[in-house]
């Protein structure tokens, strides 16, 4: 039986044309970065261009490491450049989540966060399923349904997106998330994943280092 969500995506994909230039807007975190990269892959060779934009500064070591090691081209959004694009997409968020999204007409919205009463997103393609632990899981299901094999960088990004949003399945996540995770492991780059995960520990240790240095100064008078 054909997955209705995949069928919807396949139909939407057929509407893409070479005269379109898309901007994917995200509030950058691992799940959003991975999902945007997956959407860019789904749209590859079907439109004139696809750019990923983040509305926030990226400062966390793990997010910076993810962008660096997985070569994610996420640029800072500049509203004055909106006229350069014909279409706008959003993943792992909804228009009312941030004022930076206001005033933009989105043609595609994909998210796993709960809907808010009175704030129902409107877009020609809109897929919001709170039952998933991560938007990366939804994007993985799309890739599987479209028979698109993700390369090592994209697979690692999606794997890390699921890992962070589910807290490695300790906070959330269901069977769909676990299956997507297991499928992505086969295609991901284990070395790059370890490097990104190590950067998480750096972020966690920084406050400890700071306290240790303060204590050392206090002991020395």
Residue ranges and their predicted role:
Residues 61, 84-86, 161:
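Short secondary-structure boundary/hinge segments and terminal tails
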Residues 6, 47-50, 55-58, 91, ...:
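Extended aliphatic helical segments
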Residues 50-52, 107, 158:
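Hydrophobic/aromatic residues located in beta-strands of well-ordered beta-sheets
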Residues 18-81:
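Anionic-ligand anchoring segments at beta-strand to alpha-helix junctions in alpha/beta enzyme folds, i.e.
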Residues 65-125:
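Active-site cofactor/cluster-binding pocket
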Residues 1-28, 37-44, 117-221:
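A structured phosphate/pyrophosphate-recognition subdomain
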Residues 30-32, 93, 112, 166:
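Generic detector of well-ordered alpha-helical packing
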């Amino acid at each position: 039986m054909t997955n209705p969500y995949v069928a919807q995506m396949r139909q939407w994909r057929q509407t893409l044309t070479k005269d379109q230039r898309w901007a994917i807007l995200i509030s950058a975190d691992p799940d959003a970065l991975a999902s945007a990269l997956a959407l860019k892959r789904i749209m590859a060779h079907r439109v004139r261009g696809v750019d990923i934009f983040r509305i926030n500064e990226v400062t966390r070591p793990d997010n910076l490491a993810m962008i660096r090691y997985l070569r994610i081209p996420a640029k800072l959004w500049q509203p004055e450049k909106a006229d350069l694009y014909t279409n706008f997409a959003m993943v792992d968020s909804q228009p009312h989540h941030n004022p930076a999204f206001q005033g933009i007409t989105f043609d595609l919205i994909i998210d796993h966060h709960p809907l808010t009463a009175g704030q129902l997103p409107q877009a020609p393609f809109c897929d919001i399923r709170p039952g998933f632990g991560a938007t990366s899981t939804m994007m993985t299901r799309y890739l599987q349904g479209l028979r698109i094999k993700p390369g090592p960088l994209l697979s690692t990004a999606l794997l890390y997106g699921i890992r962070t949003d589910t807290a490695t399945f300790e906070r959330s996540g269901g069977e769909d998330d676990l299956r997507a995770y297991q499928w992505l492991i086969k295609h991901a780059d284990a070395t790059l994943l370890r490097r990104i995960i190590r950067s998480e520990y750096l972020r966690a240790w920084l406050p400890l280092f700071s306290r240790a240095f303060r204590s050392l100064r206090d002991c020395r008078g």
